[in-house]
């Protein structure tokens, strides 16, 4: 592993800690998954950025799901 690979792993760990440490119990589940995949990925930086974007859109997705279920319940 060269300097570049070592840098990527350290950067990735930092990003994962930074992104997920505040999530409490969810952190215990997500941290190993995100960071293990993150470590083995050559495109570590891109992966972490994508995960960050996914986190930002999660609330929107949750609201959409609730809206759809609400509509289905009204039809029933």
Swiss-Prot record:
Entry superkingdom: Eukaryota
Membrane topology: Single-pass membrane protein
Predominant localisation class: membrane
Gene Ontology cellular-component annotations: membrane
Protein's cellular compartments: Membrane
Record field: transmembrane: 24-44
Keywords: Membrane, Transmembrane, Transmembrane helix
Protein name listed in UniProt: Putative uncharacterized protein C27E2.12
